[in-house]
Amino acid sequence: MIKFNFVPIFNGTLMKTIGKNKSSHQMRKQLLMLMMIAGLTMAAQVPLDSCRNMALRNNKAILIANEKINAAGYQRSEAKSAYLPALDLQATYLYNQKNISLIAEDALLPTKSFNPATGGYDFNILTDPTGKPVMVNGQPVPSQVALLPKSALTYDIHNVFAGALTLTQPVYFGGKIKAMNEITRYAEDLAKAMRNKAMEDVVYQVDAAYWQVVSLRAKHDLAESYVQLLDTLNYNVNAMVKQGVATKADALSVAVKLNEANVDLTKVKNGLALSRMLLAQLCGLPSTTVMTLADEGKQQIDDTSMPATTYNMDDVYARRQDLNALQLGAKIYEQKAKVEMASMLPQLAVMGMYSVSNPNSFNGYANKFAGAFSVGAVLKVPLWHWGGNYNKYRAARTEAVIKNIEIADARDKIELQVNQASFKTQEAVKTRFATMSNLEKANENLRIAKVGFKEGVMPVDNVMAAHTAWLKANSEAIDAQIDVLLCNVYLSKVLGTMKY
């Protein structure tokens, strides 16, 4: 077990200096003892606010919620960038095993000559002595041909390079870009609301664990006092048995009660140790850490003010983080419906591009780099999708309606929570006053029983009954006091006024 907030007042340098003085062995021992005593006695008491702060700093759920806020912020920045032009660079390299040839072999092409008689160009046809064209397989034979070599139509594409720098500017996307920006803004607010709700939950858990430790510590002290009372009674009864003024049965009855009290004390010790472990874990400390709480050992913690009976529910709704999260969720679904509506509207974007390639064909085919600018627009108009896009829109609208119904249901439940918490707090305060009055009577009853037993006019059974009533009254007073504190914490939680 380690003691929380152990405060050393001597550092290692001072200890080394003392250690060098061999002639002051006794002084070193005294200083070491002083250091140990000072370190132990200066262990600070931990108030409730410190436990809350440690839990808020170390709680994993809150750390995750903070990262979700960061992620939502990044997504919002991403959505804003959709308003701006996008600039992209694309480059491609392609290796081809073979070249491209448009003809399989050298080609012979027929030629034409100008005919003054017709004023046009006629094919140069081979004619016989009679002047008729020579025909082969039904086709005239040209008298002259032009050679088109295969190499002239063979292109080197072994290494192909291409690249493009493209600038795209959205002009109209049916309101989709604006809706996405609204979604990300609401999503960031939603992440913050969920973080705040997680913080409220952690604070409530820490408060419950803190007051549980205080309660069990008070019951531990009460159990020890009860054991001491019974131990004194047991001693007195045994002395009376020896004097013959009490029976053996009286002594056995007291001994049984004493054993039961010791068993109860052990149970309280175990419960207190487990409660301290839970509190340390909630604070982000090792479970073996022992913290001395500021409210431990206090005889009375005054917090018995009667709560209000009516509240402005509109103010409560505005402060509740869970309701705020639901409202933001409904807004997100409303924007999602707009996104689906945008899928049924035209989309227009303009673009500019500079492309370069090697080989290129801008001025004949050449194996070198060359490029050109291009400017254009892209228009997309949805025409017919068999109702698919419209059904997506209707589904999104339905989700928004569901969220609004959930909000109305949450409002009803919050109002019920507030009324129940207020009623429970009022009853806890009334119970607290009743237990305080009962405790005064139990203390007086125990005092009278002790006096009567001492004077010999009160039997042992009545004395033990007075002890039992005193124990019960004190235990109920402790429970009532802690219950008032926890009810006030829960009431502040449901009202949205919890401070942390």
Language-model features, listed with the residues they occupy:
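Small/polar (Gly/Ser/Thr/Ala-rich) solvent-exposed segments
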Residues: 63, 87-101, 150-158, 168-197, ...
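Bacterial Sec-pathway N-terminal export signals of envelope proteins
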Residues: 43-101, 287, 293-331, 383, ...
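Amphipathic alpha-helical coiled-coil segments
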Residues: 64-79, 198, 204-221, 239, ...
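Small/polar, glycine/serine/threonine/aspartate-rich low-complexity segments that form flexible
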Residues: 90-166, 296-306, 338, 351-381
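Periplasmic alpha-helical coiled-coil/stalk elements that build and connect Gram-negative outer-membrane
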Residues: 74, 193-315, 424, 428, ...
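Bacterial Sec-dependent N-terminal signal peptides
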Residues: 1-59, 499-500
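Acidic, low-complexity, intrinsically disordered peripheral segments
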Residues: 88, 95-122, 277, 287, ...
